[in-house]
C-alpha cells in the first residue's frame, strides 16, 4: 500500500516540501535561516493575535491599553516582550539570510530572490507600523518623520502624506489604519513566503560550493529537520533570554512616555534594524535625494543578480570578493552605529562616507573584482 503522505492531496504537498525534498548533502548552518524565519513569523502572528485581543487603536487609550496588557493581562508582559523582541530576532535572521544569499550567489535564482526582496520590504513596512502602535513619544514622532518623507515626492507629495495620515497630522485615523495594516500584512508575508518556497523548490537549493548538486542529494527529513531543530532551539534560547533578562535592551526609553505632539524628543531614531537605512537617508542633505537613497538601499538587492560578472557562482573560492563582502558587512555595522548618533561632526561625514562605500561596493567594486578574478583563473 502506498504511503498516505505520498497520495493524499494535502499531505503530498507537505511531503514534497519538508520530508522527501531532495536537498544538497553539503549545505551548512547558513541554510537554517529560512526555517528560522518561518518560526519567527509564526511566533509574531500568534503573539500579535493575543496582543490584538487587548489592544485598542485609539489615540486616547492605545498607550494605556499596552500598559494594561503588561500589568493586568495574564502573562501579558511576556506576550508583549516576545512580540517586540521577536521582531528583532526576525530581522537578525533576515539580515543573515540575505547575507548568505549574497555570499553564496543564491541570487541567481531570480524569482526566488526578487520575491525575497519584496518580502524584505513587506517585513520592514510591518515592523514600522507596529512600532507606531504603542503610541509612545518615539512611536508618534517616528510616524511623523517617516510619513513626512513622502512629501518629497514631486507634485503629489503633500496630498499623499495627508491621504496616509487621514487628516492634517498623525492622529486617530493614522493609528487605526496602521493597526489594520499591521494586522493584515503578516498574512500577506506568509503567502509570499509560500510563493518564495514554491519558486525555490522549482530549482532546488543552492549549496556552499555554488556547483550543481543534482548528483548528490539527500532527503530533507531526517537530515535537515534535525539540523533545523538545533537552530530553532538556539533561536528560542536567545529570544527567551532577551525577553526574561533584558526585555528593553533594544527598545527606546522615550517610548515609555505617552505621545505628545507638543514636545519633540531630542533624538528621533527608529528601531535598531532600520538604523542603517536611516543613516543613508540622513547622509544626503536633499530631502528627495535622501528618500531615493533610502529606497535604493534595499532595492539595490534586486540589481545584484544582473551585476554578477564572475564565472563562479559562490564566493567560496574567490578571496578578493570575500574581502569586499566582509568590508560591506563592516560598512553596514558602521551605518547602524551612525544611524543612532546625533547629527553632528564627526558622525555626519562618517555616515556620508559609509553610504557612498555601501553603494560603491555593491554596484562597482564587487563586479569589477569578479572580472579580475576571472582573469586570475587563466594564470
From Swiss-Prot:
Major location category of this protein: mitochondrion
InterPro entries to which the protein is assigned, alphabetical: Cyt_b/b6_C, Cyt_b/b6_C_sf, Cyt_b/b6_N, Cytb/b6-like_sf, Cytochrome_b, Cytochrome_b_C_euk/bac, Cytochrome_b_N_euk/bac, Di-haem_cyt_TM
UniProt membrane topology term: Multi-pass membrane protein
Positions bound to heme b b566: 97, 196
Cofactor: heme b
Binding note for cofactor: Binds 2 heme b groups non-covalently.
Record's GO cellular component terms: mitochondrial inner membrane; respiratory chain complex III
Transmembrane segments: 33-53, 77-98, 113-133, 178-198, 226-246, 288-308, 320-340, 347-367
Gene Ontology MF: a single term: ubiquinol-cytochrome-c reductase activity
Alphabetically ordered keywords of this record: Electron transport, Heme, Iron, Membrane, Metal-binding, Mitochondrion, Mitochondrion inner membrane, Respiratory chain, Transmembrane, Transmembrane helix, Transport, Ubiquinone
Superkingdom: Eukaryota
Compartment(s) where it occurs, according to its Swiss-Prot or TrEMBL record: Mitochondrion inner membrane
Gene Ontology process terms (BP): mitochondrial electron transport, ubiquinol to cytochrome c
Binding of heme b b562, residues: 83, 182
Binding site for a ubiquinone: 201
Family statement: Belongs to the cytochrome b family.
Other information: Heme 1 (or BL or b562) is low-potential and absorbs at about 562 nm, and heme 2 (or BH or b566) is high-potential and absorbs at about 566 nm.
Self-association state and partner proteins as the record states: The cytochrome bc1 complex contains 11 subunits: 3 respiratory subunits (MT-CYB, CYC1 and UQCRFS1), 2 core proteins (UQCRC1 and UQCRC2) and 6 low-molecular weight proteins (UQCRH/QCR6, UQCRB/QCR7, UQCRQ/QCR8, UQCR10/QCR9, UQCR11/QCR10 and a cleavage product of UQCRFS1). This cytochrome bc1 complex then forms a dimer.
Role noted for this protein: Component of the ubiquinol-cytochrome c reductase complex (complex III or cytochrome b-c1 complex) that is part of the mitochondrial respiratory chain. The b-c1 complex mediates electron transfer from ubiquinol to cytochrome c. Contributes to the generation of a proton gradient across the mitochondrial membrane that is then used for ATP synthesis.
Record's protein name: Cytochrome b
Source species: Sorex ugyunak
